[in-house]
Amino acid sequence: MVRAGAVGAHLPASGLDIFGDLKKMNKRQLYYQVLNFAMIVSSALMIWKGLIVLTGSESPIVVVLSGSMEPAFHRGDLLFLTNFREDPIRAGEIVVFKVEGRDIPIVHRVIKVHEKDNGDIKFLTKGDNNEVDDRGLYKEGQNWLEKKDVVGRARGFLPYVGMVTIIMNDYPKFKYALLAVMGAYVLLKRES
């Protein structure tokens, strides 16, 4: 017969007693682990800011949150965006845009482009899987989008990779648990 305490003795301590591991570390080890964690976070932020500069988009990577663009993109697809202002917007192009009063950007296809005599361009969008255009999504009284509304244009995608983000937003406790485990792993990981 195996006692419960005997089973725990064979498991790595970091999986059972995080605070016990922290107490066993000397101050230098703890400082090193915190610094290591800070380096990982700051590196991720620098990469993100670099992508913003390289792509010209305030959000160079987005996740498709609905099925409105099927069959082109499915819920959970990860899109890579660019937003170079000098490129003209064309009908058939897939854009990500923000509408005043809505927090979440929308991924839809440009179906009509209207150019005024003064050079201003306005355009209309629609989800591939939607019956009607997006005028019902725009702010009240707005019939067309302008270039200033565009967050980016879809240049590539990875299918279903963004489902992790959707799951974490749908189940916030899972998100916090995953972040806590990853943070604890980085802090408690020891060099071999």
Curated annotation (Swiss-Prot):
The keyword Glycosyltransferase does not apply. The active site is at residues 68, 108, 134. It catalyses: Cleavage of hydrophobic, N-terminal signal or leader sequences from secreted and periplasmic proteins. The chain crosses the membrane at residues 29-48. Residues 1-28 are cytoplasmic. It is a single-pass type II membrane protein. GO terms for cellular component: endoplasmic reticulum membrane; signal peptidase complex. Keywords: Endoplasmic reticulum, Hydrolase, Membrane, Protease, Signal-anchor, Transmembrane, Transmembrane helix. It is found in: Endoplasmic reticulum membrane. The C-terminal short (CTS) helix is essential for catalytic activity. It may be accommodated as a transmembrane helix in the thinned membrane environment of the complex, similarly to the signal peptide in the complex substrates. NCBIfam families: sigpep_I_arch. Catalytic component of the signal peptidase complex (SPC) which catalyzes the cleavage of N-terminal signal sequences from nascent proteins as they are translocated into the lumen of the endoplasmic reticulum. Specifically cleaves N-terminal signal peptides that contain a hydrophobic alpha-helix (h-region) shorter than 18-20 amino acids. This is Signal peptidase complex catalytic subunit SEC11C. The gene is SEC11C.
